Swiss-Prot record:
Record CDD domains: RNase_PH_bact
GO molecular function: 3'-5'-RNA exonuclease activity; tRNA binding; tRNA nucleotidyltransferase activity
Source organism per UniProt: Francisella tularensis subsp. holarctica (strain LVS)
Binding sites annotated in the UniProt record for phosphate: 86, 124-126
SUPFAM superfamilies the UniProt entry points to: Ribonuclease PH domain 2-like (SSF55666), Ribosomal protein S5 domain 2-like (SSF54211)
Enzyme Commission code: 2.7.7.56
Name assigned to this protein: Ribonuclease PH
Lineage: Bacteria, Pseudomonadati, Pseudomonadota, Gammaproteobacteria, Thiotrichales
Class in the EC hierarchy, top level: transferase
Matches recorded under PROSITE patterns: RIBONUCLEASE_PH
Function summary: Phosphorolytic 3'-5' exoribonuclease that plays an important role in tRNA 3'-end maturation. Removes nucleotide residues following the 3'-CCA terminus of tRNAs; can also add nucleotides to the ends of RNA molecules by using nucleoside diphosphates as substrates, but this may not be physiologically important. Probably plays a role in initiation of 16S rRNA degradation (leading to ribosome degradation) during starvation.
């Protein structure tokens, strides 16, 4: 039995609020159960130096957690003077996943800057960030079309992207782990897929106990099922 009482293949309650903030070109509040993340996509003219005069745009992502998004308060990383390795790893994951969904040549020499800010954490913050950011990017691209930054016929989105966590909890594969499950899981895996059914990234780690190829296949099957439900629900 899962602590939440959910079935092994059951997602948490999923809710998306578009235009959650008024300044960003795209903004979404995404909620997976008690995990809540604000995802914004900001459009900035110009590109980094390594993209200058390439005719291509760029997309980058930042990730952070509010000090009391967790059970006990943690210091802001800005106050500590540097980002943790975990934060840097998650930012890179989010950026890779989202760049796989956008035709950078189609946005011209513009940059889309994604910010994912966790306001409440209960497991699955990185996967929620990817899903919410994909929705925010779609809204930002629509803004670019409506405001003459892009031609109305432009279609920079190659696909949408969603992500979910799966794992082995009490010797059983489960979908969409909350904090209680994640902190006690024998295996934790994050899966990122696009709306065409393609796999973008898989991160899987055994926590003190290995997992079999059969268990891996079961977890991947759960992830595919969950992501399909996410696309059907919020995209």
């Amino acid at each position: 039995m899962r602590p939440s009482g959910r079935n092994n293949d059951q997602l948490r309650n999923l809710k998306v609020t578009h235009n959650f903030t008024k300044h960003a070109e795209g903004s979404v509040l995404i909620e997976f159960g008690d995990t809540k993340v604000i995802c914004t996509a900001s459009v900035v003219a110009g590109v980094p130096k390594f993209k200058k005069d390439s005719g291509e745009g760029w997309l980058t992502a930042e990730y952070g957690m509010l000090p009391r998004s967790t059970h006990t308060r943690m210091d802001r990383e800005a106050a500590r003077g540097k980002q943790s390795g975990r934060t840097q790893e998650i930012q890179r994951l989010i950026g890779r996943a989202l760049r796989a969904s956008v035709d950078l040549t189609a946005i011209g020499e513009n940059t889309i800057k994604v910010d994912c800010d966790v306001i409440q954490a209960d497991g699955g913050t990185r996967t929620a960030s990817i899903t919410g950011a994909s929705l925010a990017i779609a809204d930002a691209i629509e803004y670019m079309k409506q405001n003459g930054i892009l031609d109305e016929q432009a279609n920079p989105l190659l696909s949408q992207v969603a992500a979910i966590s799966v794992g082995i909890y009490n010797n059983e594969p489960v979908l969409d782990l909350d904090y209680d499950e994640d902190s006690n899981a024998e295996t934790d895996m994050n899966v990122v897929m696009n709306s065409n059914g393609g796999i973008i990234e898989i991160q899987g780690t055994a926590e003190g106990k290995d997992f079999s190829e059969e268990e891996f296949a079961k977890m991947l099957g759960l992830a595919k099922k969950g992501i399909k439900e996410i696309f059907a629900t919020v995209f």
